[in-house]
């Protein structure tokens, strides 16, 4: 398990889906762009998915703590929105 911390800008629409089978009820998937212009796909489940869908939108800046999975995507464990001044 690889824990990572990322800060970036949301560059895609947040795709929210309900899951029929499995341990999770819902998922939110979107992409962020970090400072060096790398684009990373991130995903959150259940409560985090609800927060992402209801509170975030394209062009928001976020800080994420997550787990790097085998596909190179980040599964969000904690997330916080911030603004640049």
PLM regions with names:
Residues 1-85:
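Single-stranded nucleic acid-binding surfaces, predominantly the OB-fold ssDNA-binding core
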């Amino acid at each position: 398990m690889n824990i990572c911390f990322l800060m970036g800008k949301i560059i895609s629409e947040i795709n929210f889906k309900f899951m029929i089978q499995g341990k999770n009820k819902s998922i939110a998937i979107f992409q962020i762009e970090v400072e060096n212009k790398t684009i990373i796909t991130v995903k959150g489940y259940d409560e985090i998915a609800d927060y992402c869908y209801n509170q975030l939108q394209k062009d928001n800046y976020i800080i994420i703590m997550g787990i790097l999975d085998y596909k190179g995507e980040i599964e969000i464990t904690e997330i916080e929105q911030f603004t640049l001044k």
